Structure formats: C-alpha cells, structure tokens
Amino acid sequence: IGLLGGNNVFQYAPNPVMWIDPWGLVHEKTKGYHVYGLFDVDSKGNPIGDPYYIGITNDTKRRGTEHIESGRLSGDGKISDRKTKLIPLHQDVTYGQARGYEQAYIKHYGTRTGNIGEDISQENRGNKYNSFDTNSKTRRKSRQNYFMKYFNKMTERLDKLKGGKPCA
C-alpha cells in the first residue's frame, strides 16, 4: 500500500478488491461484511440453480458494479437486462464469519471453477481462489480457529440441505 494509503495510517484499504491485506490487518471480529452468491436468473429475476460464484464484501452495491464491469455479472446494470444477479446470503457478519461461510459455500457448490490467468467472462466466471486455506499453519492460530469455526458451522448446515438451496 505504501504512500498510496493516504494520510490516515489507521485506515483500511479503500478498495479491498484491488488492494490486498497480506498481514491480516482486518481483525476477524470486525463487523459489517456480507456473503453473497452470483446466480443465473430467470426473466423474473429468480435464481436458477446453484450459485456460480461466492464472495464477501463490505459494500454489495459497489461489488455488484465491479462484477458487471469485470463480466462476471451480465447486463448493463439495468435490472431488466440482467441474466445474472448478486444475491446476499448473509448480511452484517464479522470478517471471520464471512471468510468461513464463503469457503463453505465455495466447497459445497463447487464454484472454484475459474481459470487463473484467464480473463473473467461468462464462460470463466467461477471463483479462482479459495476464501482461505483450511489447512493453514502460518495464520495466527486464533484467527485460523475463528475462520474454521464458521466454516465448520456452515459446512454442517449445507450438508443437511435438501435440494441445494442456500440458507441465510
């Protein structure tokens, strides 16, 4: 981040999609994160099938716009033109809960289908990376345990589902 971070040295990166958090500066118990899925939708905007991408954000409107710009969401931004849709699955959870839930959904729905190094498109629109390494030995133990606590809780819930419908 260097000097691009601005005058406030305590501020988190203003664009967490483009800026990374390699040192884990966002505390796992920080609130205000949302887990969402990207779905194909019918003409009425209802989801068809399982999500093809799972993500987390602290601003769903901004993130939806970024997905339209990248090609992961189709349409020009008008609701009536969309063939895909961002649907919140969990709102206002902690960062650690969001990471755990996100990884559980990625695993459950098999959305890690994106090809690293290839442009995002409607053909290459799945997750390219896992939310976090469930076997990490380098992450602070309490942080890893917090992520895993919510990964395990959501995995258990998803394993009990019938018909693969997301549960909020």
Language model segments and positions:
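Short turn/helix-capping motifs enriched in Asx and small/polar residues
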Residues: I1-E28
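Catalytic toxin/effector domains delivered as secreted proteins or via bacterial secretion systems
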Residues: V26-A168
